[in-house]
């Protein structure tokens, strides 16, 4: 039987003169220019200390006459010790009064910049959303970090270079402050700032972030992308990747009909002005492509990205922390496409830049922010906490990361726990473990989200299983407190299989967390228990959580450890535990 794998360019329409010109002429120039910047970045890892100090004292000097700078004595700070003495470690609450004035137009409360492009909104994974000013320095560092990431990925995968890119971005104009400054996702702003000739490489239009219905965004991405040899997909959260793949298979008949007829299914709800601008492109019929895809479906019965996009396509998404359960499902949908972690990046700024496939570790981005580290287990807010610079870290040790940024955050505890996995030159390589907030301690066991995800990953691997969304949560009982695994009824097929997963996780937690083992042996903790939930529960729960915190779908991370002790009892009262 002939293969229908999309390995031949003949399966896609000819790219056309303009796109060919981009790859040949513009592509060569960009590769040379950005490659030179990447080499400078990699070379700089040999001397991070002077770069970090120049960045720190540059920020202090620049903002010394702001109200925050005067209130905290920036002008008198001469050394790192002075800086740490004048400005204790803090969360967002310290800067919020100044930030509120910036939102009202009083920029000098916190920043010396006269221009604020927008406010980046946090993802809503902790409490409520926070606003982060995007000034020129923030934007330059943000774009430089992505350039370094992309150039290194293309250098390692030259077949993918300067070919169509599918990137999911958010809306940078979700709302507006009282002073008229837009608030939203930085990805939306940077998409609008790209040169038109470069934008032709992107499958989705720059304002696709304004599509609020996620199913419609997936459908449009597939409708436009099925006719192009997409060679890079960027969506920070791997759940987005899987949902995209599933959406394409679920809607394969509608997609092929649209490609054949030159239409867009009316269930795809996109803004009218966007639809009008895409009308000419959507009206093009693709009978040859439809014929090929029909052959794929006849052969396999399904239609996944591995069937319609080249195998040299690069998947850019998070791979660390709790992402393992999603990544194990990738081969089914994406075959052997390369996976490149996009790095530890948040609305507050980029922290790491990964440079290898299948490795969540990345180089500390020493040019974007000034970084400090507190050994995990110490309280970062304590005046006696140990604070280290990047070059002082120890390989194998875990740390809480602190940021001082161009956006007015100083010694800011972002609650991220990272592990130093080694060094490039003298600059640390860091992998994300979990949010410091995702930490449970019923009776001294100090269970982290990292413990949970590692136990689940290993249990699934040993049992030869896959898992959908899940969470572990503390379950209070006056006599036998314990932890529960909360999964939907169809997650593992049968209750017996789910119980095997629970039993294996219980053993692994005891092996990898000596405090958990001690509390189990002493009877202070009962064993992990199984809680089955109705199908669709987690999708609804995540949706409600996103709505409550006004989070961004593309940035959202489902918590694999829920720390509230009443989670199980609340579900039981609502009759949701089966």
Indicate where each model-derived feature is located.
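Active-site diphosphate/adenylate-binding microenvironment
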Residues: 54-119, 131, 137, 148-156, ...
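Conserved adenylation A10 loop of the ANL superfamily
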Residues: 119-132, 244
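Short coil/turn connectors at secondary-structure junctions
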Residues: 161-164, 228-230
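N-terminal, positively charged nucleic-acid-binding surface of large information/translation enzymes
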Residues: 167-173
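Active-site glycine/GP-rich loop and adjacent strand/helix microenvironment
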Residues: 2-75, 83-87, 98, 105-107, ...
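Conserved beta-strand scaffold positions in the cores of enzyme catalytic domains, especially
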Residues: 131, 165-167, 339, 530
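A short, flexible beta-alpha/helix-coil linker loop
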Residues: 128-129, 173, 437-440
């Amino acid at each position: 039987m002939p293969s229908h794998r999309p390995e031949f360019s003949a399966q896609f329409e000819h790219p056309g003169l303009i796109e060919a010109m981009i790859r040949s002429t513009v592509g060569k120039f960009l590769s040379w220019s950005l490659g030179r910047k990447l080499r400078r970045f990699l070379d700089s890892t040999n001397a991070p200390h002077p770069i970090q100090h120049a960045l720190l004292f540059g920020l202090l000097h620049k903002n010394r006459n702001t109200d925050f700078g005067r209130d905290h004595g920036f002008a008198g700070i001469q050394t790192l010790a002075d800086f740490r003495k004048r400005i204790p470690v803090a969360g967002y609450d310290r800067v919020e009064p100044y930030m509120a004035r910036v939102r009202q137009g009083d920029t000098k409360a916190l920043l010396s910049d006269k221009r604020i492009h927008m406010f980046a909104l946090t993802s809503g994974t902790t409490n409520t959303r926070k606003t982060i000013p995007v000034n020129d320095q923030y934007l330059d560092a943000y774009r430089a970090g992505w350039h370094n990431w992309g150039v290194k990925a293309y250098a390692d995968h030259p077949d993918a270079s300067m070919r169509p890119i599918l990137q999911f971005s958010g809306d940078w104009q979700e709302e507006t402050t009282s002073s008229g400054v837009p608030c939203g996702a930085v990805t939306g702003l940077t998409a609008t700032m790209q040169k038109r000739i470069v934008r032709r490489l992107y499958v989705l239009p720059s304002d696709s972030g304004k599509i609020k219905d996620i199913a419609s965004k997936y459908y449009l991405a597939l409708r436009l992308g099925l006719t192009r040899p997409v060679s890079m997909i960027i969506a920070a959260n791997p759940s987005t990747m899987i949902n995209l793949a599933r959406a394409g298979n679920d809607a394969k008949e509608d997609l092929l009909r649209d490609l054949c007829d030159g239409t867009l299914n009316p269930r795809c709800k996109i803004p009218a002005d966007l639809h009008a601008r895409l009308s000419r492109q959507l009206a093009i019929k693709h009978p040859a492509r439809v014929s090929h895809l029909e052959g794929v479906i006849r052969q396999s019965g399904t239609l996944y990205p591995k069937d319609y996009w080249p195998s040299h396509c690069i998947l850019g998404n998070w791979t660390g922390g709790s992402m393992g359960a999603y990544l194990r499902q990738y081969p089914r949908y994406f075959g052997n496409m390369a996976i490149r972690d996009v790095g530890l990046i948040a609305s507050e700024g980029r922290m790491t830049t990964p440079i290898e496939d299948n490795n969540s570790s990345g180089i500390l981005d020493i040019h974007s922010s000034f970084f400090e580290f507190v050994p995990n287990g110490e309280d970062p807010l304590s005046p006696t906490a140990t604070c280290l610079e990047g070059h002082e870290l120890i390989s194998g040790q875990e740390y809480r990361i602190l940021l001082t940024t161009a956006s007015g955050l100083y010694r800011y505890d972002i609650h991220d726990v990272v592990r130093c996995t080694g060094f490039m030159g003298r600059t640390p390589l860091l992998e994300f473990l979990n949010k410091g907030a995702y930490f449970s301690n019923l009776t001294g066991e100090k269970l982290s989200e990292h413990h949970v995800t590692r136990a689940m990953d290993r249990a699934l691997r040993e049992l030869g299983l896959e898992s959908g969304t899940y969470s572990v949560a503390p379950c209070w009982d006056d006599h036998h407190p314990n932890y529960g695994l909360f999964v939907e009824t169809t997650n593992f097929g049968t209750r017996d299989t789910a119980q095997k997963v629970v039993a294996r996780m219980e053993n692994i937690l005891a092996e990898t967390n000596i405090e958990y083992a001690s509390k189990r042996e002493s009877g202070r903790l009962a064993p992990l228990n199984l809680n089955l939930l109705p199908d669709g529960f987690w999708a609804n729960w995540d949706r409600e959580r996103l709505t409550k915190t006004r989070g961004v779908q593309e940035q959202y991370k489902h918590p694999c450890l829920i720390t509230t002790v009443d989670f199980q009892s609340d579900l039981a009262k609502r009759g949701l535990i089966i």
